[in-house]
Regions:
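Short beta-strand/loop segment that forms part of the nucleotide-sugar
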Residues: 37-47, 67-71
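Short alpha-helix within the catalytic core of nucleotide-sugar-dependent glycosyltransferases
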Residues: 27-28, 52-53, 83, 91, ...
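N-proximal low-complexity "stem/linker" segments adjacent to membrane-targeting elements
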Residues: 1-32
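The conserved acidic donor/metal-binding loop of glycosyltransferases
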Residues: 98-102
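Short aromatic/hydrophobic "clamp" motif used to bind/position activated sugar donors
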Residues: 94
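Glycine-rich, basic loop-to-helix element that forms the pyrophosphate-binding segment
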Residues: 72-89, 106
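A conserved acidic beta->alpha catalytic loop
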Residues: 29, 44-55
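Conserved donor NDP-sugar-binding/catalytic core segment of glycosyltransferases
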Residues: 106-141
Length: 156
């Protein structure tokens, strides 16, 4: 059996369009997950050539499998790409994550624990103040205690 034919427990599907800095932060966060049996599928709705080149470099450095699906930019066709990603997935359990959401370290684990046949699991996001969002960086996401540092300012 080819490695790409092998099943994985979870496919995480991320819609994407030119937001490479956010995607890099998401990849850093996925590298810190407590649950490791997952793949990431980037459903790209026509990103620029320079962005795709940077994405390919980023994909090569990940400790988890990443598939990049791309279609020509012919207007907003995000849902078409999401459907293609579902078909391409190697798991029976799918998680959809927007391209500007940084998952906490137990994101995949908690989704798997909540999984029930015939049900959909929906999570919440935390709307960050603009100043906090604009100050996000790969270095901050990679730093120890990132989640703790992020949550406390929001609570007080």
């Amino acid at each position: 059996m080819d490695a790409m034919d092998a099943k994985t427990a979870v496919s995480i599907i991320i819609p994407f369009y030119n937001g490479i800095d956010w995607l890099e932060m998401i990849f850093v966060a996925f590298g810190k997950q407590t649950f490791k049996d997952f793949e990431v599928i980037v459903a790209d709705d026509g990103s620029r050539e320079d962005v795709v080149a940077r994405l390919e470099e980023l994909m090569a450095r990940q400790p988890f499998p990443v598939t990049h699906l791309w279609q020509e930019d012919c207007g907003f066709r995000k849902n078409r790409m999401l459907n293609k990603a579902v078909v391409q997935s190697r798991a029976e359990y799918l998680i959809f994550l927007d391209g500007d959401c940084i998952p906490h370290r137990k994101f995949v684990e908690e989704h798997c624990k909540a999984r029930r046949e015939g049900f959909v699991v929906a999570g919440r996001r935390v709307d960050l103040p603009a100043a906090l969002s604009e100050g996000m960086s790969v270095g901050k996401v990679a730093s120890p205690g990132f989640e703790r540092k992020l949550v406390w300012p929001l609570l007080y």
